[in-house]
Amino acid sequence: MEKCEGIVIRQTSYRESDKIVRMYTREFGKIGVVARGAKKTKSRLAAVTQLFTNGYFTFFGGNGLGTLQQGEVIETFSSIQQDIFMTAYATYVCELLDKATEERQPNPYLYELTFQILRDIDEGYDPQILTQIYEMKMLPVLGLYPTMDKCAICGETTGHFDFSTSSNGIICHRCFEKDRYRMHLPENVVKLLRLFFIFQLDRLGNIDVKQETKDWLQKAIDTYYDEYSGLYLKSRKFIREMDKWENMLKKDSDD
């Protein structure tokens, strides 16, 4: 019998009334368990196995899937559950975590980061910015280490910088001619990318960013992920389509 604190990051139906639940836990990293009878509304496991739920779990372990015995809800993130936009971003966070990690490789920092991101989304902070911070923080988990504290080519720490996927990081104006395909980013966008990658989430505070800046950030992050991560995430595609519709609606209302 094992006990842990975890977040439900994925659930799938299994047989008539059971679920297979994927959790990211503080103690064990990512684990999978069978929750017997959890699809029944009166089941004692129904609430604690809902997507995004943070709770205490007791389970029988094994080489494959464990068997969930009981759970206690700590936090349900109810605002996320009730808002389609919050749900979309939270789903992407969980899918990225699922695809980027292996079974039973504990990473308490990553657990805490994921909890903080979901909590802040639930509390109404900008989900797009929070997700972009999470994407940058997940790069080392994927084995990706872009040079963000100095020029990736010459090592200079001062000057104007652009972002270069081919050089795996930022490059200074002295080296611009060495990469004519670099991304020409506004200075504040480069600064934010560096902050997102280097600083802890609690040091960043509540960041108020214009939509144009968020669009630049997303373009840079998406380009880097497409080049290096090897991941295809359905939830990311859905968010991008959702953002397009939201921007179109805003434009129509402004007109």
From Swiss-Prot:
Top-level lineage group: Bacteria
Protein name: DNA repair protein RecO
InterPro entries, A to Z: ARFGAP/RecO (IPR037278), DNA_rep/recomb_RecO_N (IPR022572), NA-bd_OB-fold (IPR012340), RecO (IPR003717), RecO_C (IPR042242)
Keywords, in A-Z order: DNA damage, DNA recombination, DNA repair
General function of this protein: Involved in DNA repair and RecF pathway recombination.
UniProt-listed NCBIfam families: reco
Organism: Listeria monocytogenes serovar 1/2a (strain ATCC BAA-679 / EGD-e)
Entry GO terms, CC: bacterial nucleoid
GO biological process, one term: DNA recombination
Family: Belongs to the RecO family.
